[in-house]
Amino acid sequence: KRRPAIAFVHLLLPPGGEPHASPAGWIGSLDRARDTLESLRIPTIVSSASPGNAEDLNELSEMDPEVLITTSPLLYAAACDVAKRSPNTVFFACTDETVHDNMSGFQARTYEAHYLAGLIAGALSEDGVIGYLANDPYQSKASRLRNANAFTLGAQKSKAAIRVLYAPGNDPDEELKTLIAAGADIVDLERALPSLVERLREHSVRYVGT
């Protein structure tokens, strides 16, 4: 039996799905890449795994793919565990954390979009105070800080005296209230959830985000 060349492992989505897993989004882009590989007669397989569950990945690694790609930062821990036990497979993990001998990392350049968001927020802010809510659970801590720093640099490029308030996203609803109470007139939302957007509208606070 021919050894699979490349295995793609997506995050197992909760019931009802995940709006960011749209055909035009991150997973859709990876699926198009897989389609291209198939068109070149490079055999691939695709699967999904639960966060932190190494057994899901271990079952796939037992098929002995040449390359195994995990497409979510939430699969990083499981990928690390399985990579140590699968020396004949090359792993690519969606992470900016520590990698290993047979594991490399890749990450989207989300900070570029947040820099542009900062340029806009800094230019449009009337009160000189804006906020950043790091509420995307799919981002690592390092990615969140990098995105927030890029947002701040963009805002300062537009308005040198701008104040940027940072909220780590541990309790998005309460932290958003705090940002509003502190005078932020524009907030960058890593995830523009309907409940957060509605609260901003109630207080006539603008936002940027996805």
Where does each model-flagged region fall?
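Periplasmic-binding protein-like
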Residues: 65-73, 92-94, 182-193, 206-210
